[in-house]
Structure formats: structure tokens, C-alpha cells
Amino acid sequence: MSPRASFLNKQLAKVAVIAALLAERVDGVWHVRSLGAPHIGQRPEDELISAFAERLAELHPTLVSFNGSSFDLPVLRYRAMIHGIAAPGLTDEYFKRYSTRHVDLCDQLASFDQRAKVVSEVW
């Protein structure tokens, strides 16, 4: 079985942890701080998703991920729907392929060519 074929189906995935850093440039100096990494041992999945979506709506950050547009963000959206969470922060510009609000490094490295993605080789 190929690594790509054995990868977890997005519709079956559950959120176990959401970790994020916030980088802000103030007077030419970058400041990086953790937004935390709560996990399901601390809070239920619906609270993790709701809190993250609220932070996105509040901060309007540019997201940087690796394969986030193909896996992480769709999983968050599916799980929000399953839990009945209104998550406007998860339906914004982050899902548009060439968005300036979400930089997916996997897509960038592959020049947006699905055949050139390195995900299957990483796992």
C-alpha cells in the first residue's frame, strides 16, 4: 500500500491538539509568542476548535502551515460542523488556494502541483 493511500481520511480524523505561535513585527523587531497548545486531555474537542476559531476571528492572522490547506483546515471545518460550532474564523480567506491569509509551505514547495507534493515521502 502506498503511503498516500494509507494516510488518514479527513472525515474520520479527530482533533487532539491545536498548537499555534503568533509572530508580530513591532518597530522592525519580530516578537514570537505561543498561543498555547491545549489538548483533549485538558478540554473537549469542541472547545479546542471553538477557541481556535474565535482566536482566528479575533486576530485575523496570516496562517503558515505544512499541508494545512489539504488536511488540517478541512479537518477543523469538518469537526466544527459535526459539533455544530459556528466558526466564521475557519471559513474565511484561509481556504482559497492562492490566499495571502494562508501560506501552505507544502503547496509552495510543490509550486501548487499535487503530483509534486512531498507529503507522502515525509510520512
Where are these regions (language model features)?
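Short catalytic helix/loop segments, enriched in acidic residues and glycine
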Residues: 1-15
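Metal-dependent phosphoesterase core characteristic of DEDDh/y 3'-5' exonuclease domains
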Residues: 13-42, 54, 58-123
